[in-house]
Structures are given as structure tokens and as C-alpha cells.
Amino acid sequence: MATPAELGPPPSRSLPGGWTGHAQPYIAVAAAPRPGILLDRDGTIIVDHGYVGSVDRVELIDGAAEAIAEFNRRHIPVAVVTNQSGVARGMYGANDVDKVHQHLARLLTTNQARIDLFLYCPYHPEGVVKRFARPSSYRKPGPGMAKAAEAALNLDLAASWVVGDRHEDIGMAEAVGASAIYLGSDPLKRPRVWSFPSLAAAAPFIVERVAR
């Protein structure tokens, strides 16, 4: 397992199949595995304007920052896990994703909230940028980003939660044995999946179960 010093300083560090940027200079790693929360980005924390690759398109969803702040108060590790095929499609670069995450981290800080770890996958098999034009297990619904968060934050994935507004998010949760929250108007009838209209609405439910 990586130690905080091995993770290196922000904003970014490459992984063998994905990318990670740290909102905090270093993250505290617990001695024993613990539950964590893996959040999708667009449609969960910020408004999904479609391929958000610049800071001027970052808009917090109402109540999202407050929900994250509550997780922080409960000392529950929080990671962002987001597919960013816009990099592979040539719509924006990896540096642009880092800038968006740095900006998002600052916005959350003004609301007394923080993300412990940002993870994203820039790969897509139909990409036009050769470096990123390939399949990757880091791309949701693959397990790669969840496994990376597990290693970086010393998580117990079986006791952790994945929250997102797409079926890919639920697929990643199922791939690693985590519970899932689906954000949408049509509930998903699948084992260990609960549906809520927003992260803010789901937060008390998650906190109650993590505290058990």
C-alpha cells in the first residue's frame, strides 16, 4: 500500500492505466482498512454540462458541497472517480482535467468541504488521440479506479459506497463488491443499490450505514 509520501504532491500523478490528482497535499492513511465514498463527478457533484474540460463550466450541484462536508466531519474518506473520455477524443487535455479538479477543490474549500483523492480515466477505445485510444480497466464500469482508491486511501471496498448518475457507476460498484447509490428518477432494482434524487438526499442514508 502506498504511503502519503509515496503519493507525492499535487496536482497530478500518473498511474498504469489511469490518472490521479490530489486535492490535499498529503492524505492521512488509516492503519486498518475503512469504508470510503467514491463519487462520480459530473451529474453528482457538478452539473453535467457535457465534457466539462474548463473551469468556467464547473457548477456545483445544490447541496453537494454540504454533503461532502458532512462526510468529512464523519472522517469518511472521499474520492472522485470520473471517466474523462474527452481527453481521448481530443476535446481537452489532461492538464485541463487537473485544472478543473483544482478549481473544484477550491470551490469545495469555500464550503468547508474537501475531496481526499481525485481519480480519472482519460482512455476510450474510440479516441482520436493515439496515446489514449484504447480500452482500460480504469474506465468505469471497470474496477481500476476503485482499486486505485482502495490502495491510496486504505479502503475496505466491501464496506464502501459508490455514488453516481450512470449505470457505469453501478457497474464499478458491483465489480468490486461495494454498495451503490444511483442518482436518478428511475430506481434501479438491483442488489445493494439504492436510488436518490441527489447526493444531498443520499448523504444521511450513507452516513447512517457507514456508522453502523
Describe the function of each predicted region.
Residues 45-62, 87-96, 110-113, 129-137:
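Metal-dependent phosphoesterase signature
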Residues 55, 65, 76-81, 91, ...:
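Short Lys/Arg-rich amphipathic alpha-helical segments
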Residues 8-79:
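Active-site neighborhood of HAD-like aspartate-dependent phosphohydrolases
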